[in-house]
């Protein structure tokens, strides 16, 4: 059984899910050093919905790669669900990604030869023994994103918005600690983008933790909170709307 599913029950609202402490990411170019992240300390808590914003060179992309366990910090601590991951090997980081992080990309990244149901199940292909509930959960997620009647459709038979819905369902198959969305509405028209943002709202209302990376202020303000970076540091934290009352 994926650890993400087992851990979901202990992601209580308000508890730390992602903890960054004095995180630095330094790139060396000859004799020069570029401090992409410069002493970042921040905590994302269960049930929160954040947008992460910043201009080119702010450290936004570097932070995205660290949060997604695609890269590791040069120094500092990065903990997911209490587990230190900053010093893990590539194979260990890959396992953490599969267990704790759900990705939604701008380009959907669906496999053309697979249908909707099969694409949703892709993250479980990497497990030696996919859980018995896998197909049932995939069907439920397809229903959840409004594609229960299109399980046999291939990506080229779906609109851009429908493909992104498949990508969101795929990202949720392991009950991740965080849903990490990178410019998730960037390839969509304004109407479809609003539909995807509405889906994020609904998932957040169900208790999902969402980190939405975007360069568009109107999209960023849609989240409850905004973390703005500049020169690898936190420049501003904005609370766009109050947390819903329990």
Across the structure, where does each feature detected by a protein language model lie?
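ABC family nucleotide-binding domain
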Residues: 14-229
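H-loop (His-switch) and adjacent beta-strand-loop-beta switch element
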Residues: 226-239
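ABC-family P-loop ATPase nucleotide-binding domain
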Residues: 1-26, 236-246
């Amino acid at each position: 059984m994926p650890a993400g599913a087992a851990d979901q029950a202990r992601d209580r609202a308000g508890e730390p899910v992602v903890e960054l402490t004095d995180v630095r990411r330094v790139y060396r170019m000859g004799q020069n050093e570029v401090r992409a992240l410069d002493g970042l300390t921040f905590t994302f808590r269960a049930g929160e919905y954040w947008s992460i914003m910043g201009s080119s060179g702010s450290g936004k992309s570097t932070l995205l790669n660290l949060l997604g366990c695609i890269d590791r910090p040069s120094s500092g601590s990065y903990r997911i669900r209490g587990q230190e991951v900053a010093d893990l090997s590539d194979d260990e980081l890959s396992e953490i990604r599969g267990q704790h992080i759900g990705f939604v990309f701008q380009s959907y990244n669906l496999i053309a030869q697979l249908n909707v149901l099969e694409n949703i199940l892709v993250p479980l292909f990497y497990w030696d023994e996919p859980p018995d509930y896998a197909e049932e959960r995939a069907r439920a997620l397809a229903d959840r994103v409004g594609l229960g009647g299109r399980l046999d459709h291939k990506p080229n038979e779906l609109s851009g918005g429908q493909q992104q819905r498949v990508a969101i369902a795929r990202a949720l198959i392991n009950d991740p600690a965080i849903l990490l969305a990178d410019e998730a509405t960037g390839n969509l028209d304004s109407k479809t983008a609003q539909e995807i943002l509405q889906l994020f709202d609904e998932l957040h209302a169900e208790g999902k933790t969402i980190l939405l990376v975007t360069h568009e202020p109107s999209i960023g303000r849609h989240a409850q909170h905004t973390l703005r970076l500049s020169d690898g540091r936190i420049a501003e934290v904005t609370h766009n709307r109050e947390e819903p009352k329990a």
